[in-house]
Amino acid sequence: MTVYGSHEGVGEGVLASGTGSAGLSGMEPVTLEISGKHWTFNSLKDLMGKASPMRSGDVTAGCAASCDEELVAAQMLLADVPLAQFLEEPLIPYEKDEVTRLIVDTHDVAAFTPVKNLSVGAFRDWLLRYETDEQTLAALAPGLTPEMVAAVSKICANQDLILIASKCRVVTAFRDTIGLRGRLSTRLQPNHATDDLKGIAASMLEGLLYGCGDAVIGINPATDSVPMMQELLKLIDELIHRYHIPTQSCVLAHVTNALEVMRAGTPVDLVFQSIAGTEIANGVFGVNLGILQETYDAALSLKRGTVGQNVMYFETGQGSALSGRGDWGVDMQTCEARAYAVARKFKPLLVNTVVGFIGPEYLYDGKQIIRAGLEDHFCGKLL
């Protein structure tokens, strides 16, 4: 039995497990006593879900804490879990999920070395240290898995998430550079209800006059067809080159359509795709790692970037795996962090987390949406 000291204002914390090792061991249940009440967690997956700050989607999925006391108990226990345990105990089976295989197979053991002996709680303290700077975090990133980063985010206050994320720089480039300190880039989104080219052109010019569009000029087409995608891409490309605008274009259609228009010689800058953190959820989007790799390679081969070759544009969002019945019982925020492992493989220019987009059944109100946005920003920056 492993016994933890008292936690001020909470009471005595006692962790009971089948072994004398610190943290959780395999799938053995663990129990924490707080003020005379015992809270039991059956697995690392269960502990991660119960340690997540409340959100409606986790309640619907049945993996959320039942009350604030259980949430605190789970967070206290999670803080003592060794980071290395996430390498030993995948939340989603390696044999049944290609995203898990990607995470495990690409883990950089050497990069992980500086924090390999830390617990989740000690890792939080390490991240908050003044000495942990931008260069240190950049070197560490390949050694972190999404589950490690998701775990530490669950025991961070909002201020912690903001402070730690502010230490990280994620700089990408295509025709311009995004992510430098002190800069803010915006997407120009000249959508039209009927994909009318004149209406879209007018909207683009108006947006440019407002100084928008340096991140991307990206259109959500009303109809997801190859001919319309070609027309829209040609329109944006003509505008960019006529006025020598240092930005990039994207039509937010499926990657298979993008692959088809590239083969036809249509000018494609960025390739868009919605992605998720599990193989099943990505299958709902009609993609897998193989399709993404094929499209990524095709876009790279065009060599259309002038200052960089980050050619992918991904969209993610907490709840996508749950809505696609591909969550494996894992909480929404951890599934979302796993989507960033998919994104990381393809070195994207942009990753857009559409926080709260699915609806209140996943993130109920402004408080939950703000928390989710801070978590996503934190996890994406660290990874």
Give residue ranges: language-model regions.
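Anaerobic metallocofactor- and corrinoid-dependent redox/one-carbon enzyme cores
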Residues: 20, 24-201, 209, 216-383
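Mature N-terminal, pre-catalytic/accessory segment of carbohydrate-active enzymes
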Residues: 4-5, 15-18
